[in-house]
């Protein structure tokens, strides 16, 4: 499991994408799968920034885990 916590700032959306891409490399995804997962993470992080926290003082947490080959990404 990997836990990441960052400020609710739109610049940190890119960090979430990079960390996710590095984490999922062990699954050997093709480019389409990689793009789909990174897009989903971007949208989830952006939604947290826009709708949950209206200032950069809010914290967003992201947990990435896998069990039996199933990837789980939780963003809150």
Q: Language model features by range: what are they?
A:
Residues 1-3, 48-76:
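Conserved beta-strand-loop-beta-strand hairpin that lines the nucleotide-binding pocket
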Residues 3-15:
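STAS-typified acidic loop motif
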Residues 17-42:
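Conserved short strand/loop->alpha-helix "switch" segment adjacent to the catalytic nucleotide/phosphoryl-transfer site
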Residues 43-47:
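Conserved polar catalytic motif of the HATPase_c/GHKL fold
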Residues 1-6, 26, 30:
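A short, mixed-charge helix-start or loop-turn motif at secondary-structure junctions
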């Amino acid at each position: 499991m990997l836990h990441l916590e960052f400020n609710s700032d739109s610049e940190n959306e890119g960090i979430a994408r990079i960390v996710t891409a590095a984490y999922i490399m062990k699954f050997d995804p093709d480019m389409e799968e990689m793009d789909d997962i990174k897009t989903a993470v971007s949208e989830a992080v952006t939604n947290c920034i826009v709708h949950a926290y209206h200032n950069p003082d809010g914290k967003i947490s992201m947990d990435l885990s896998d069990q039996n080959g199933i990837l789980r990404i939780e963003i809150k």
